[in-house]
Amino acid sequence: MNDTEKRKKKMKVLLVNGSPHKDGCTYTALCEVSEALNEQGIDTDIFWIGKKPLSGCIACKSCMKNNKYVFHDSVNEFLEIAGDYEGFVFGTPVHWGGASGGITSFLDRVFYADLNGGGNRFLLKPAAAVMSARRAGTTATWDQMNKYFGLMQMPIITSRYWNMVHGANPEQIKQDLEGMQVMRVLGNNMAFFLHCKNVALKMGISMPKQEPMVFTNFIR
């Protein structure tokens, strides 16, 4: 499918649930973002990374040849469909003041495989991170999550506050009225960006020219 055909299709955003709980607090926050996107004419799907252990990258370099991982798990399942989406929202619970171990291994491998395998699934596609916590650690987790998007040239979508919700269960999350509003504003802002990008492409504004990557090691 070429760029023109893609622009004629309805735009889609994939929301990734990085919690071991399929229908828990993180899911509740993502659903609020999803509903806001839907109201603005953007289709959405939710992808759960699952609760099975996810290995970190083992530096085998197989992704450079196959554009996927040597382990067949939810990472490869995600890579197979990621190119069909125009934007991404990654959700995670806060574990020990940072992102969950599952989503950390998941994103390490997803972006490394795409970058080294030449998949080009994420270039200039908007991304956002959503954090769910009982109490603290959300801002440190947000910083951690945004680093992935910064390396992949993914515009980072924000809300009117940092993208976090608080509560120990879905019912408590829904009582975080400000947090839920932040989720809705986030969805609206991502929809606005996607519509603006779509108009720009229709008007003939080209994507930025990509330069060959240059690597400079910190050796001095």
Where is each model-derived feature located?
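N-terminal beta1-alpha1 ligand-phosphate binding loop
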Residues: 12-40
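Glycine-rich phosphate/pyrophosphate-binding loop and the adjoining helix
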Residues: 11, 39, 155-220
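A short beta-strand-loop structural module common to alpha/beta enzyme folds
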Residues: 42-52
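Short, Lys/Arg-enriched N-terminal segments with co-localized hydrophobic residues
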Residues: 1-10
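Helix-loop-strand module that forms the ligand-binding subsite of alpha/beta enzymes
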Residues: 70-161
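Cysteine-cluster motifs in flexible loop/terminal segments that predominantly coordinate metals
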Residues: 52-82, 215-219
